[in-house]
């Protein structure tokens, strides 16, 4: 269900005093990536600035994403929290909104123990939506090791995928090895959470990416994925390296600061602003980003 190229959508904000949601801009971004051939949508992840949205805004963005997807491709909602009750609240809201699945970042800051993590994921999974575990230790302060992911997969039937952003290929291979022969209704999916590792992850048995770069160059990323799936590895590798400069530029500052400015430069949204405590991309880095983007026109 969640294989292929899935953009981690930005959440555009207006330039008014409250930085209100730019729903028209969100819809425009969604149509752009769908025209680019992506295989799904993720709303309200790290790239979508879920951390600085109210619950009402968070739910509105999920609803708008589900509506805009219009059953053409799956719509996934980021509903994770370091507070299990909040994760339950947002996951129930996602289910009510018609989301096809949820992405649950591992609880950050409070560093739960193993049994706490297992109980957290089981409790949220009991709501009934397909669950994608999100492992990003650089943001959460805690890695989810391969043996823990495998135990989750063995004991939570609707835990269907992991977004792996640890940067550790050995760990990813261990997850793939440990889950590929399990007796499940659907094969367990491992998707890359690092754009620079999408092709390497595919090459060791991964299934796609949840991508920042796909907000800006969905077509090229989908072409790379399709070439790999057709076993044209040399052509896929060429596409991969073509995208490297852009992928690096989109992380010249903390995500999603550069990608929102890139979307503004491309005319997808009116403003690339972000909410505090993040700050928008400055003039010098904006000029660098423009130069990189010009090579993809």
Swiss-Prot record:
Associated pathway: Amino-acid biosynthesis; L-lysine biosynthesis via DAP pathway; (S)-tetrahydrodipicolinate from L-aspartate: step 3/4
Highest taxon in the source lineage: Archaea
Catalyzed chemical reaction(s): L-aspartate 4-semialdehyde + pyruvate = (2S,4S)-4-hydroxy-2,3,4,5-tetrahydrodipicolinate + H2O + H(+)
Main EC class the enzyme belongs to: lyase
GO process terms (BP): diaminopimelate biosynthetic process; lysine biosynthetic process via diaminopimelate
Molecular functions per Gene Ontology: 2-dehydro-3-deoxy-phosphogluconate aldolase activity; 4-hydroxy-tetrahydrodipicolinate synthase activity
InterPro entries named in the record: Aldolase_TIM (IPR013785), DapA (IPR005263), DapA-like (IPR002220), Schiff_base-form_aldolases_AS (IPR020625), Schiff_base-form_aldolases_CS (IPR020624)
Pfam family, one: DHDPS
Compartments reported by the entry: Cytoplasm
One Gene Ontology term, aspect cellular component: cytoplasm
Catalytic residues (UniProt): 134 (proton donor/acceptor), 163 (schiff-base intermediate with substrate)
Enzyme Commission designation: 4.3.3.7
Similarity remark: Belongs to the DapA family.
HAMAP family linked to this entry: DapA (MF_00418)
Function description: Catalyzes the condensation of (S)-aspartate-beta-semialdehyde [(S)-ASA] and pyruvate to 4-hydroxy-tetrahydrodipicolinate (HTPA).
Protein name: 4-hydroxy-tetrahydrodipicolinate synthase
